[in-house]
Amino acid sequence: MPTPVAAARQCLSPAAVPALDAAVASSRRRAHAQTTSLHLISSLLAPPAPPLLRDALARARSAAYSPRVQLKALDLCFAVSLDRLPSVSASSSSSGAADEPPVSNSLMAAIKRSQANQRRNPDTFHFYHQAATAQTPAAVKVELSHLVLAILDDPVVSRVFAEAGFRSGDIKLAILRPAPPMPLLGRLPTRTRPPPLFLCSFAAADDADVPSPAGNLAGAGEENCRRIAEILSRGRNPMLVGVGAASAADDFAAASPYRIIHVDPNTIDRSDLGVAAAMASATSGLIISIGDLKQLVPDEDAEAQEKGRRVVAEVTRVLETHSKVGRVWVMGWSATYETYLAFLSKFPLVDKDWDLQLLPITAVHAAATAGPAAAAAGLMPPATTVAAFSKPAASLMDSFVPFGGFLCDNYEENSLTANSCPQALRCQQCNDKYEQEVATIISASGITAEDHHQGGLPSLLQNGSMMGPNNGFDPVKARDDRMVLNSKILNLRKKWNEYCLRLHQDHQRINRDPYKPFPRYIGVPTDKERSANSSKGSESVGVQKDVIKPCAVSAVHSSSTARPISSPSVTNKRNEDLVLNLQARHSKSDENLQERGMQSQHGTLSNVDNPDDHVSPSSAAPVETDLVLGTPRECSSKGSSSTCSKRVEDSERSVHLVPKKVDDLNLKHPQLSVQPNSCSWSSINVGKTSHSTLHSVASGGFSAFGQWQKRSPLAAQNSDLSNYKLLVERLFKVVGRQEEALSAICESIVRCRSTESRRGPNRNDIWLCFHGSDSMAKKRIAVALAELMHGSKDNLIYLDLNLQDWDDSSFRGKTGIDCIVEQLSKKRQSVLFLDNIDRADCLVQDSLSDAIKSGRFQDMRGKVVDINDSIVVLSRSMIQGSKNGLEEGLSFSEEKILATRGHRLKILVEPGRAITSGCPSGKVVVSPRHFLTKIQASLCSGSISKRKLSISDDQEKLQESPSSSKRLHRTSSVPFDLNLPVDEDEPLDADDDSSSHENSYGNTEKSIDALLHSVDGSINFKPFDFDKLADDMLQEFSNILRKNLGSECMLEIDVGAMEQILAAAWKSEEDRKPVPTWLEQVFARSLDELKLKRKHVSSSTLRLVACEDTVPAVKGDGLGVLLPPRIILDC
């Protein structure tokens, strides 16, 4: 039923009421029975109406037609549509001439939809508080823009627009994103104006190749990257929409200095967003790419919809946690506007929670044909350092006009200098003097530091009202002053370049410009940095430039004086003051070095912690620092040797960890000393990047634990701490235990990778020694290090140096060192794990000692192999500082578990009897925790007949003395030399206590101790608690026994069978737990079979024993060779 006009008028805002009145007048004039949406749109197209719809049509028209022709066609289409509407009769018209035509149901439905949209959007709805009476028709007044958006959804109106060549989606987007003010747009030069927003391509299909009017526009990809970077600089998250959105995202990822992590519904469960976001504060930043929005809004697949919700929930959690303390953004794209609206309708809170900003992408450059396909497949390239924004000098000069273009002054002058003088290299001394003169010119020009900082910001971010005629801002004068200033700076740079090239030809030169891969506006400062930088004045211009620009990663020769660009990792006032303080101190140190003729680059520097010797003469010059974390063993003076040794002891001390998340680990980052001007890694290693699964914490493609240039002491410490925590978390996920050992290992690795090696600047190898038992944990750590540090598990080289294990045919005719050299020649970058180092022969030990000193191995034939980028792990079963290698107080030893082989198991059924609490050997394991189920395990230690089927009830006594089981198994590492005569004076009954053997063994121990004292880190491993594992296994047996046979049945497990089960559980991987599977599938099935064969088995005593014959290996059963696929039943 039509609605009266008065009732509809009460639902509209004062700005929308005149439009409805004009529509009603048009309907009355045409003698129509109702006022429809066509009347309202037709009235808005008339000149007296507000220009909202006309401006949107001007920007949303098709480029295939002339604007005048298309708009005239639209007027004609609406006139024809109105003429087709039915008219009332003449008598009805004359009788009701004074009555207003009521509002049609379609128009009233559009008004109601507008009210609902405004009510759901708290940012745009307005309440007109009227008298709180029941007759109040509505509390939300519909604005004109929302009314037009709702009417455009009417199929009748959309069909009329389509006949004229318009699309409702394009008109909606034009209304939501109004054009910038005309005076601002008119002041832009022709070359820097953005392309017109012809959004007809937004409704194209995702995979359609629709030609764009800006498709051949030069620099379209560059323009899109600048627009994306502008949104990031505002602290908002871009959402790209249009046919060119995929290629724009691909181009930005290729040229961005940020780390980009792609997240989609299929990889959200395996992604480490929390870890990467935690590291973002110590790097240039992190962008989470959710890819195509179409993946998050599937049509009917319930599972895919659930995955999409998990993606949105995880990204929201990361943004809420790390957006305020780190540099974390989110970015996505969609080829159609309808997909974007469907995404917002499915997740209505995302627009506000993520702080999204819609960015239309209508320009697709021809060189990016492969970009959208790659982006659509979810392949976002990693962050690289590509100079993607090089523009001709003419267009760059045009961008100096105020409010025009997004390039800042600093980037333009760098580009101009690079074009005019390609060999713009200066030594350190000339560069400092040049920067001092630049700071003087800037301070004398009257342009404050705030204005200079705003010169590199987009025009809409600069302070002040740019459009006000009486606000005191003269754009022409600002443009002229800025052009004059930049001209002076260019002349200064050219002068100092020529001066340095002419007079300082033998000096080390620096070139900081090529290390700026991205315009400086991409270094997004935090709010605290902006406020701090804007209030410092003109003398802090140089410091500001260093704080906001991104980090450029490079590796240079140790003798070079190139100073890296500082990282924008300062996120609070306290850390910022620390960085500025260290930079000021180092500035004075650099000045003193320059006055001495740059001769102290390789000498001993003064202590950086002395405040009296490091007072910055002027903070006007830009200062940077290349302070890196020094080696704890390297001290600047003899007086600090005791302090350094104490730091070494502290750094090698293990820290207790709680095995949860990395943020919950009670970690202590390495105790590293900070030394100024430390030598960086050698230039010969540049490009030798390891293919690590860990992404770099800084852009440049380097491994997270490879070589990088230090930015500042604070940034270096933050980076090392992040790497340390990340490495601990990854190793703990693989190993699952030995928290203290993992902490010490990661501390040693980060310390060695972060500082110059104590063996020389060109040495990148790391030597570790693992002391103690738990050999499975050691091997898992070695495998994890090979995968994390060198990209694959295949980069692990494992060799057991025990003399008794060299009977294999593959080792025949080879010595231990020959095998090491052969394997290292195949895998240059690897983890070399040498087990049982204390049982190796003297030749291997001597070769290892030489390799630690020289960094290379040499076999018996003279072949030499380098170990420069490898990690060498030496392992021994004896704990450091202990003379006994046995685990005291444990019922099961690792030596016995390792010697266990897979035997068949058998269940013996005996009549019910009470299990005594002891056996003749006195070794009984009865856990009070499992006594509730009346299950006990009688573990008779060392029985000779424990693997035989004929086991007596009284359990045979031990045949060997307890002392023999506790005797440490030692194999003499001194080989026999047949060329030496036999010592006749040696007694025939010589044993281990003879003096000759003690001397040889003592010499071997000294050689091993000297070798192990030369490693970078010694780590003690705790013995594995097999008793606790046995208790867990007993509990599993108890649960299955109670479930299948009841609580009255008793089970007695032979020690041989128990050792076999413990070995299977210990040697299995963490993600594969074969023992619970075996219990459920094999043991439980055997109990069911036994229950069918024996009637009163529930009141009997069962014994699980091991047989003599071994279990044949069966492929694909998943149980391993230690667990038989079936258990023999003795009924």
UniProtKB/Swiss-Prot annotation:
Region called Disordered, residue ranges: 511-574, 588-655, 951-970, 976-1002
Sorted UniProt keywords: Nucleus, Repeat, Ubl conjugation
UniProt keyword annotation of Ubl conjugation present: yes
CDD domains: RecA-like_ClpB_Hsp104-like
Summary of the function given for this chain in its UniProt record: Repressor of strigolactones (SL) signaling. Subjected to a negative feedback control of SL signaling. Suppresses the transcriptional activation activity of SPL14/IPA1 in SL signaling. Acts with SPL14/IPA1 to mediate the SL-regulated tiller development. Subject to a negative feedback regulation by SPL14/IPA1, which binds to D53 promoter to repress D53 gene expression.
Post-translational modification: Polyubiquitinated. Strigolactone, but not karrikin, triggers rapid SCF(D3)-dependent degradation via the proteasome.
Subcellular location, record wording: Nucleus
Name of the protein described by the UniProt record: Protein DWARF 53
Basic and acidic residues: bias regions: 646-655
Tissue-by-tissue expression: Expressed in the shoot bases of seedlings, young leaves, axillary buds and young panicles. Expressed in young roots vasculature, culms, internodes and nodes, preferentially in the parenchyma cells surrounding the xylem.
Compositional bias of kind Low complexity: 558-569
A GO cellular-component term linked to this record: nucleus
Motif EAR 2 per UniProt: ranges: 799-803
InterPro entries found in the cross-reference section: Clp_N_dom_sf, Clp_R_dom, P-loop_NTPase, SL_signaling_regulator
Induction (UniProt): Up-regulated by strigolactone treatment.
Motif (EAR 1): 578-582
Annotated PANTHER family: CHAPERONE PROTEIN CLPD, CHLOROPLASTIC, PROTEIN SMAX1-LIKE 6
Biased composition (Polar residues): 597-609
Residue numbers spanned by region Repeat 1: 12-85
Biological process annotations from GO: response to strigolactone
